[in-house]
Amino acid sequence: MLISVCLSIALALPSPGALGGSGPTPWGAEAGDHNEALLANITALGRPGNSIPGEVVAFGENSFLVASAGGGDGERGVIGAATFHRGRVLVFGHSSFFGGWGAGADGEAFLLNSIRWAAGKEQPRVAFLAGGHDLAARLKVHFAETGHYQRCADLPLRGSGTDVVVWVGGAPDEEQIGRLSAFVKGGGGVLLGVCPWGNQQIWDGQGRGKNIRTDLSQNQLIGEMGLVLGDATVGDAAYNLASNRALPHAGQAMDAAVAYITGSEGEQEIAPGSAASQVAGLLRALPASDDRFLPRIQSALEASSFAERVPGPGHKTRKSDVAGHLGMLLATEAWRDTPASRVPAAPGADFFPGAIPSGALRITRSLDVTPEEARQGGWISTGLYAGPGEVIRISATGGAAGWKLRIGAHKDKLWHKDSWSRWPEITLERQLVMDPGGSFEVASPFGGLIYFVPPRNAVGAAGANGASFMVAGAVEAPLFRLGDPASAKNWKQRRAAPAPWAELVCDGMILTIPSGAIRELDDPVALMEYWQRAADCYPELRGEPQPARAERMVEDIQISAGWMHSGYPVMTHGAERADHSAAVDLDTLTTAGNWGYFHEFGHNAQKREWTFSGTGEVTNNLFSLYLGEQMAGIEPWNNPWLAGQKDKPAEYFAKGSKFSDWKRSPGLALMMYATIQRDFGWEPFQTAFKAYLEAPAAESPKTDAQKQDRWMTRMSQALERDLGPYFEYWGVPITEAARGEVAHFEPWMPEEYGKP
């Protein structure tokens, strides 16, 4: 079966028979006694400062969580512990837990409890690995210190004066991990803290983020102890404590998940969604050397109808579908490391991102990337498409150091959603590392449009080099480039190219839409001239040149948040209909615009310096109003989106103009800006934005109060009017110092508000 083949290839799993007994396991049976010691006199714990810790997963018989955050399917461990042979280990989801907790006295008291618990004595001797100087200074009145060490090999371990090692960072090698493991087995204690999701941001040699399952040294150590650091983030401010409630245990969740997959009789204590979520967090982090849990879930999935449970026409896969959820997860993880020649087409790939017609030619094409394109950065479109599970061969002339290849534009990951209309993760990006023959092979189980991504050091660099590539095994995709006479001349032929996804390109915007939506598009020139003008509007309002990198917009059938979201690319729904796209409906775009498109690109254009608390969904809509006027002839004050907002100010003023209410209502807040625009036009906004750009970086406002002051003074200076009374009327706090800066101007208030 597919799942069996994929997993056995990539994970090198032993046979399910290696599991041994199948009776119930007393997961975390000793947790109560240990947590009583760890949480003695602790009433509350919370996030350390402004850090975002990662997840800690407990899955072994002798491991348990001490603190978690959230609830239901979204509950995540953040501090875990385990006993291992004669020793003990305590794991934190971030090193900042050691650096001044920021959660009151209980945080520091908990660290004292933790060190004593790990040592099994009141006055342990503590060594610090790869840091911990601040912690040592704070704790020196409580414990004897045996030193600070940058290398595990230098640690004085058991028999040499150390009871507990506090591991603050670094990445010891396999030999050093062995020393720490032996230290714990012999009765030593280890406290470690690391941000696992932060490590995923570090690129490996293949152009991928670090894999916490294979690359995170800490997981290689604590995995054998029944703990792993997972890839989820835990941003909650307050934590659940084991002294107050039962916390999740992935071993127990695994029992429930297997029962749900195999249809075993008996009611489970853990709901399907929670079981699947907990096991998913474990499987994404569990080292491949595990010979118990991975084979167990693989064996259960092999007996299920996995391929029938993936998303398809008229069928979503719910997170609570344990077999579908975990089957897709394990297959996705397996395919990451599978050699290109052995990557299969994923079940459901023909549904999305889509099928390639039978008989479509696989072609070889040479592509030249100019130095200018390399400097611009971003994804460089090729007009080529990789079929699901089909090998793409790349060769380069003049070297490809630092270059990456991307397959697929639909980059949103959906694992956090309650249900999936498509596989949750369907794109890949790889470093171009040529084999001795000078070529590189890659395959995606889902297929997708092919892009080249320039080296980071080339982006914006005057001396950036271009590159020449040969791509073999791809299918031609519809592609139009505004300003290229050949592209316009050959459009009627190119729009019939067989790939299921098309791209329309101009200097400022690239649209990625279903090919079916452009098969009848006769005038791509007029359409992309519209989008070029739209792209120009954003820097035009901000008073700055067009950015070098074009914006991108990609249609999808499901995205990670909302109906649309900002970023690179802007992601939007719309692919549900393969024969239609609002992005190519020029008649509607020129008469009504598209508030959603303009809004999301407005997020990309807004600046922190003039966006303070409560205006994240406001300052971007200045661009929505501007483009509505420029691209569809809609007067900003008469924009339909404002129609439902115009009655709000009177009610707000009548209630006393409370700033907290203002910040909670983006439509109300936008009226404050729109009223100025109505009476003075766009020029003062352009003048104010340009003043921000021209100001020294050291003068950039940082706090909300500074941003509020600066926005009032910049706009007052642009208008040559004192806006202090206007801001006061709206309830937006301004300091007396800022009021004084513009007091020499004539005060202004809209006519309908009365005299200032």
Question: Which residues are covered by each model-predicted region?
Answer:
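Beta/coil-rich, acidic/histidine-enriched accessory regions frequently appended to metallopeptidases
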Residues: 305, 309-355, 362-363, 704-756
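Short alpha-beta junction capping motif
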Residues: 82-96, 108-117, 125-129, 156-207, ...
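Activation corresponds to long, low-complexity, non-globular regions
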Residues: 234-235, 240-347, 501, 507-516, ...
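Active-site-proximal alpha-helical
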Residues: 252-284, 511, 646-739, 747
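Catalytic cores of extracellular degradative/oxidative enzymes
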Residues: 490-493, 497-681
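Beta-strand-enriched, solvent-exposed domains that form extended recognition/catalytic surfaces
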Residues: 339-477
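A short, well-structured beta->alpha microelement
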Residues: 139-159, 436-437
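Catalytic beta-strand/loop cores that center a nucleophilic Ser/Cys/Thr
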Residues: 23-85, 100, 137-144, 162, ...
